């Protein structure tokens, strides 16, 4: 009988973008929803904070919010951005850089959608704050390639052994971070109620270039 030897191997992913996923602490979810409610439920404030003219979405409301009104949230976004770069390029282009944010809330209802688009920044992110009560049942009913209300990231050209898309089913608290140039879209849904998400861009300018880093 041939001698059994333990196979040792590594699998590398040298090409294509990475997507970071984590869970938003409940304290942030509550504070972000409270600030979103304050603006969304007031027609005057909704108009003052309207951000839809800068966005691709076909949705009920998209309103800008001030991240500094959420204690420690800017620091949380920076921490996640640092972790993303630590994993992808093993360097920290944010340290010592000038960092800016643009944060907004997307309030969607049945039939709303967001077509394929990219963002103008360094990193972008999405966090889910609310989903309709009947969303899970609607998703489960779609027995073939369920996508109702889902976020989809689109990468390379379809090919053997190369995944070209990733579909993220919304769950309250899920937080995604990705390169701003990564194409993504949001599918419509039919359930009654609000699908609410937080979207943001992180911009930074390096005072001193880092060798091998192009961001």
PLM features: what roles do these ranges have?
Residues 182-185:
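Short, charged beta-turn/beta-strand-edge "cap" motif at the junction between a beta-strand
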Residues 90-102:
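A short coil-to-beta-strand element that immediately follows conserved catalytic motifs
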Residues 2-93, 111-114:
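Non-heme Fe(II)/2-oxoglutarate
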Residues 197:
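A domain-level signal for the structural core that forms small-molecule/cofactor-binding pockets
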Residues 101-177, 187, 194, 204, ...:
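Catalytic core of non-heme Fe(II) oxygenases with the double-stranded beta-helix
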